[in-house]
UniProtKB/Swiss-Prot annotation:
Keywords associated with the record: Ribonucleoprotein, Ribosomal protein
Family: Belongs to the universal ribosomal protein uS10 family.
Record carries keyword Ribosomal protein: yes
Coiled coil: none
GO cellular component, one term: ribonucleoprotein complex
Protein name stated in the entry: Small ribosomal subunit protein uS10
Gene Ontology MF terms: structural constituent of ribosome; tRNA binding
Function text: Involved in the binding of tRNA to the ribosomes.
One record GO biological process: translation
Subunit structure: Part of the 30S ribosomal subunit.
Length: 102
């Protein structure tokens, strides 16, 4: 291939599904003969939401909700056409966002 590296960035709310998706990608890339660097765990993004429990008053009574976004980075070095075709046909679990840069 003309490009020397494919960078795959994965995002998910559950780290177990994210790790299984990363494992599938690494296994597919190594099976087709490419060199893989990763998965590298990136910092977890944490969103915190504070909501008043009561509808009209009692501002001191609040509830907090948290949403965590886990991220992984995988680099595929020297991919072949066979590697790209296998990655296009790969079935990943739902709930995993995949960003690919060539």
């Amino acid at each position: 291939m003309a490009n020397k590296k494919i960078r795959i960035r994965l995002k998910a709310y559950e780290h177990r599904t994210l790790d299984t998706a990363a494992e599938k990608i690494v296994e597919t890339a190594t099976r087709t003969g490419a060199t893989v660097a990763g998965p590298v765990p990136l910092p977890t993004e944490r969103s915190l939401y504070t909501i008043i429990r009561a509808t009209h008053k009692y501002k001191d009574s609040r509830e907090q909700f948290e949403m965590r976004t886990h991220k992984r980075l995988i680099d595929i070095i020297n991919p072949t056409q066979k590697t790209v075709d296998a990655l296009m046909k790969l079935d990943l679990p739902s709930g995993v966002n995949v960003e690919i840069k060539l």
